[in-house]
């Protein structure tokens, strides 16, 4: 390949920034690394529960992407509107950008559309601004029934909804008002964190039972009924009452509704030929290569099947490891051979995440998700050391930028 190549990385989240920083260390300066993201800044998803509980401010869990240029990277804040993976050409805000290697790490887009009536009523915390609005709504909450609901899997970080439920329960329990509240959780899934197995699911159920949180598994939300529903979709700034209709026709009343939005692949991929029938990009499990030469995909936009019928969780820890591995594959393509002195990294499906449980503690969930018969996953009992581990994880994330 030419002495001056261009690698384009779409998305600067966990996977994209890990790929960019690792690749920069593997390639000499004449080789360009261009990172494209429609956002001027990114936030740490694991920190959103800190924002909604008032523990941290939004600026403490976010990073401006313009700073990545100090690491020898180029950055363009623009929307990708199309991609031709066969020619490795991106359409970026009206421009055509040709790449010698292309890494797709655009993340997933969030939507309330599969749940009619949710607009203007349902809060969420997967967006940083939404997490802040939810925190304000919790501050002003006067009591009643809090209902959390998963619209549909898959979604980012399988532990996040359960962490949020536990921390919201703790926050409301400590608040001078409301005088009385209850918290319920509804999901179409058969148990908490299904990919982690029955033992982990039972442990999370026990955490709920200890706090009096009621959970309904196998219940699919189909419609929100509330006078405050708005077709335009203006996000709520306060608690709004109504009822959540489920697939079996029953209704769950609420005074504050919090949902986990549905996740979809970005629109620019729909006509690319990259999406499989399940709506995500299929990749080689260990190399993250797509079916197109010189094109890789990592993170939330991918679908990686597991033994037992599940899929690899959409989680930052996996995206980061995948990004590091992909960087070695890109470098080998650009240089014609693996970089001298480097050890090629292959994605092994091992990793873990933190599940804050309140009282200054967190549980740590870790596993080998590529185990032959089924993922092998363990949930360690809540401890203060695990929460310290999450805080360290957040600091390490910030250093990537």
Description of each model-found segment:
Residues 2-73, 152-198:
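Beta1-alpha1 glycine-rich phosphate/pyrophosphate-binding loop at the start
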Residues 2-8, 73-176, 258:
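FAD-binding core/adjacent interface of flavoenzyme oxidoreductases
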Residues 32-34, 71-83, 97, 169-282, ...:
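A Rossmann-like FAD-binding core segment of flavoenzymes
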Residues 94, 106-107, 248, 261-262, ...:
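Glycine-rich, N-terminal phosphate-binding loop of Rossmann-like dinucleotide-binding domains
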Residues 118-142, 235, 251-321, 332:
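FAD-site-proximal beta/loop scaffold in flavoenzymes
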Residues 155-172, 312-322, 352-363:
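Short, electropositive alpha-helical surface patch
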Residues 170, 317-347:
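Internal hydrophobic alpha-helix adjacent to the cofactor/substrate pocket in enzyme cavities
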Residues 361-401:
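C-terminal auxiliary extensions adjacent to catalytic cores
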């Amino acid at each position: 390949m030419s002495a001056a190549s261009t690698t384009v990385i779409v998305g600067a989240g966990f996977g994209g920034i890990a790929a960019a920083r690792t690749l920069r260390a593997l390639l000499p300066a004449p080789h360009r690394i261009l990172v494209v993201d429609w956002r001027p800044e990114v936030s740490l998803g694991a920190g959103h529960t800190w924002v909604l509980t008032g523990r941290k401010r939004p600026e403490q869990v976010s990073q401006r992407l313009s700073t990545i240029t100090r690491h020898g990277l180029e950055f363009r804040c623009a929307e990708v509107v199309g991609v031709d993976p066969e020619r490795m050409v991106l359409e970026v805000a009206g421009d055509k950008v040709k790449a010698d290697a292309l890494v797709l790490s655009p993340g997933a887009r969030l939507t309330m559309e599969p749940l009619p009536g949710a607009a203007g009523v349902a809060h969420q915390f997967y967006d940083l601004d939404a997490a802040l609005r939810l925190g304000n709504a919790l501050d002003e909450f006067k009591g009643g029934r809090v209902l959390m609901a998963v619209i549909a899997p898959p979604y980012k970080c399988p532990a996040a909804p359960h962490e949020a439920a536990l921390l919201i329960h703790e926050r409301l329990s400590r608040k001078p008002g409301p005088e009385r509240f209850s918290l319920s959780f509804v999901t179409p899934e058969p148990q908490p964190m299904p990919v982690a197995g029955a033992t982990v699911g039972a442990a999370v159920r026990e955490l709920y039972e200890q706090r009096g949180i009621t959970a309904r598994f196998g219940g699919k939300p189909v419609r929100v009924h509330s006078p405050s529903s708005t077709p335009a979709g203006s996000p709520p700034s306060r608690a709004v009452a109504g009822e959540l209709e489920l697939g079996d026709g029953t209704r769950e009343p609420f005074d504050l509704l919090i949902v986990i939005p549905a996740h979809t692949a970005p629109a620019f991929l729909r006509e690319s030929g990259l999406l499989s029938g399940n709506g995500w990009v299929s990749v080689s499990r260990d190399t993250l290569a797509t079916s197109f030469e010189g094109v890789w995909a990592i993170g939330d936009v991918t679908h990686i099947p597991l033994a037992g019928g599940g899929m690899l969780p959409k989680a930052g820890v996996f995206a980061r490891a995948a990004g590091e591995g992909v960087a070695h594959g890109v470098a080998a393509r650009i240089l014609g051979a693996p970089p001298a002195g480097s050890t090629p990294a292959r994605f092994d499906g091992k990793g873990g995440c933190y599940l804050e449980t309140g009282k200054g503690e967190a549980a740590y969930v870790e596993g080998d998700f590529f185990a032959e018969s089924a993922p092998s996953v363990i949930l360690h009992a809540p401890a203060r050391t695990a929460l310290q581990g999450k805080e360290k994880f957040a600091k390490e994330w910030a250093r990537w930028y």
